[in-house]
């Protein structure tokens, strides 16, 4: 069953569809977490686990709003910027990686 079909079932009140959708999306969440961690140079297992947990919470939040419009694209396309943004914010706040990243690179703010 596709993500979009499970999402429609969840919106119609099928709580088991949400569980199946979450299980189906775990690989996608892990992929976004890996990309986010690598962007900031911190891809240890503990950080990846934390990012996956943050991603799961953001997934729940995004799905519960009911704002996803299937006609505008796939569910993963809709979710990706939300998950990535949540993970970036988590890294910046909890790991202060933005400062390390800026000072290790040649970038100097004006």
Predicted feature descriptions by range:
Residues 1-98:
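Alpha-helical promoter-recognition and RNA polymerase-docking modules of transcription initiation factors
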Residues 100-110:
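Internal acidic/polar
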